[in-house]
From Swiss-Prot:
GO biological process: L-histidine catabolic process; L-histidine catabolic process to glutamate and formamide; L-histidine catabolic process to glutamate and formate
Keyword line: Cytoplasm, Histidine metabolism, Lyase, NAD
GO molecular function: urocanate hydratase activity
UniProt xrefs under InterPro entries: Urocanase, Urocanase-like, Urocanase_C, Urocanase_central_sf, Urocanase_CS, Urocanase_N, Urocanase_Rossmann-like, Urocanase_sf
Signal peptide positions on this chain: none
Active-site residue list: 408
Protein name per its UniProtKB record: Urocanate hydratase
Cofactor info, note text: Binds 1 NAD(+) per subunit.
Pathway field: Amino-acid degradation; L-histidine degradation into L-glutamate; N-formimidoyl-L-glutamate from L-histidine: step 2/3
Length: 558
């Protein structure tokens, strides 16, 4: 196709490639999989998730990327600048086949206003995290991490289970859509507010949401009934969180657990303010942009004020990394940061172990390949109770979106073992085609985000972004198949920088070497980052597992 028009995209399946190597073929299939209608939020606009997180800058750029990947040699590297292929360079076979940089701006200009001007001029693209790095796998991609968060809340506040509790949250997009099922897995009842009825339907169809209430009062009545019965159940309700959460205050009804995962990171294209019955939010945004922005900020302020009041009344309240607190603070809510972020509250100990999201995709397109890897991992890590529980549940309950895929959380000296296993399975034919291995940018050592992953670091190094740059370099030096460096994922422009790694297990001996190196060093950066910040748990892991940290007097004993 040469007209560069929107069209339905679906990744090729099977053991035969049209590119010159499996890495190039994998990159092409994963780019296309990001835009599969089962996967992407708005594929016709190249938007994958997270407000306007895109896979390619425009359809012309998409076509050029696909064509270039098909002709790319095994010792060449494609450079992609904010979703546009800009060069092919001769490198070497251990170099990444693709290097991606998305949304990066010099710090003084790292804001939405500058980005929007460049975006409108066709010069930039917002890549979110895994949208522009071609490793998004649908809502499952965040599900176990979301479960880890709610399980952490259960452990800290509710005796280890959310049974007999009600969680209220908002947002059923690509990220937030994991919340209802995650709360259910942790044993609880949830009410999730979502303004877009198509997103509600999508979560029902993919079994991430159980049922939809007629209104907020109906949702509360249903939730109270399930809570009394000790039943885990998820309820959706259509509405605007900036209106419904304050209604909870007015109704004098307080949930047990409260958070939010609307797209507050992007005030213009993510968070939708309340509008009058005779108004259209999209039209208001396009015709009266400044009024829309002001309304969005006012709505976020009202939303957070209500959350703060519910916190005072006893709701365990946390921020889910969408920068809602910062937006409310900018709108005049001085105590917006009175409730914590989810990472310091529940996840940091895992990061100290280099433990984070590890995902893989079957390029064959055959679900049986994923089920085979599930079984193999259960045998490889019999002592990991969380992994055993998760993979057993996932194999039975999780609906695939696009190419069959799986995610689990693994740490330092675990991811490399899993990758070796997968490569052996490709080599001996236990799976029908190569396997792509990647992760979210939300990981132990790959991101600087002071209101999310690096919030409240022990040594005050929240905003130091040397670490994701080092992570990016380490992946390149260690044999990754493609690497990405992005700005603004999760919390919006000006508030984060982060790196992504993807590597292909194609069954070859060379792949085995790359997998071992890359998937040891990448999670190792998480241990290193937290050990350097002074976390005792990370220091213990570094000593026990043999990481050479010269400034801390720890040497590799492996």
């Amino acid at each position: 196709m040469t007209t560069h028009e929107p069209r339905t995209v679906r990744a090729p399946r099977g053991p035969h490639k049209t590119a010159k190597g499996w890495i190039q073929e994998a990159a092409k299939r994963m780019l296309m999989n990001n835009l599969d209608p089962e996967v992407a939020e708005h594929p016709e606009s190249l938007v994958v998730y997270g407000g306007r997180g895109k896979a390619a800058r425009n359809w012309e750029a998409f076509d050029h990327i696909v064509a270039t990947l098909d002709r790319l040699e095994n010792d060449e590297t494609l450079l992609v600048q904010s979703g546009k292929p800009v060069a092919v360079l001769r490198t070497h076979e251990w170099a990444p086949r693709v290097l991606i940089a998305n949304s990066n701006l010099v710090p003084h200009w790292a804001n939405w206003e500058t980005f929007d001007k460049l975006d409108q001029a066709g010069l930039m693209m917002y890549g979110q995290m895994t949208a522009g790095s071609w490793i998004y796998i649908g809502t499952q991609g965040i599900l176990q991490g979301t479960y880890e968060t709610f399980a952490g809340a259960a452990q800290k506040h509710f005796g280890g289970s959310l049974k007999g509790t009600i969680t209220v949250t908002a947002g059923l997009g690509g990220m937030g859509g994991a919340q209802p099922l995650a709360v259910k897995l942790a044993g609880g009842v949830s009410i999730t507010i979502e303004i877009d009825p198509t997103r509600i339907r999508k979560r029902l169809e993919t079994r991430y949401l159980d049922e939809v209430a007629d209104n907020l009062q109906d949702a509360i009545a249903r939730a109270e009934g399930y809570k009394a019965q000790g039943v885990a159940r998820s309820i959706g309700v259509q509405g605007n969180a900036a209106e419904l959460v304050p209604q909870l205050v007015e109704m004098n009804w307080t949930p047990d657990l409260l958070t939010d995962q609307t797209s507050a990171h992007d005030p213009m294209w993510g968070y939708i303010p309340p509008v009058n019955a005779d108004e259209d939010a999209g039209k208001l945004r396009s015709e009266h942009a400044e009024e829309y922005r002001q309304r969005a900020y006012a709505a976020m302020a009202a939303h957070v004020r209500a959350m703060l009041e519910l916190q005072k009344r006893g709701a365990v309240t946390f921020d889910y990394g969408n920068n809602l607190r910062q937006r409310a603070f900018e709108a005049g809510v001085e105590d917006a940061f009175s409730y914590p972020g989810f990472v310091p509250a529940f996840i940091r100990d895992s990061f100290c172990e280099g433990r984070g999201p590890f995902r893989w995709v079957a390029l064959s397109g055959d679900p049986q390949d994923i089920y085979a890897t599930d079984k193999a991992l259960l045998e490889l890590f019999p002592e990991d109770e969380r992994l055993q529980s998760w993979l057993t549940y996932a194999a039975d309950q999780i609906a695939f979106q696009g190419l069959p895929a799986r995610i689990c959380w693994l740490g330092y000296k675990e991811r490399d073992r899993a990758a070796k296993l997968f490569n052996d399975m490709v080599k001996d034919g236990r799976v029908k085609a190569p396997i792509v291995i990647g992760r979210d940018h939300l990981d132990a050592g790959s991101v600087a985000s002071p209101y999310r992953e690096t919030e409240a670091m022990k040594d005050g190094s929240d905003a130091v972004s040397d670490w994701p740059l080092l992570n990016f370099g380490v992946g390149i030096a260690s044999g990754a198949s493609w690497m990405s460096f992005h700005h603004g994922g999760g919390v919006g422009l000006g508030f984060s920088q982060h790196s992504g790694l993807v590597i292909v297990a194609d069954g070859t001996d060379e792949a085995a070497k790359k997998l071992s190196r890359a998937l040891t060093n990448d999670p190792g950066m998480g241990v290193i980052r937290h050990a350097d910040a002074g976390y005792d748990h990370a220091l213990d892991v570094a000593r026990e597992r043999g990481i050479d940290l010269p400034s801390l007097g720890i040497k590799d004993h492996a």
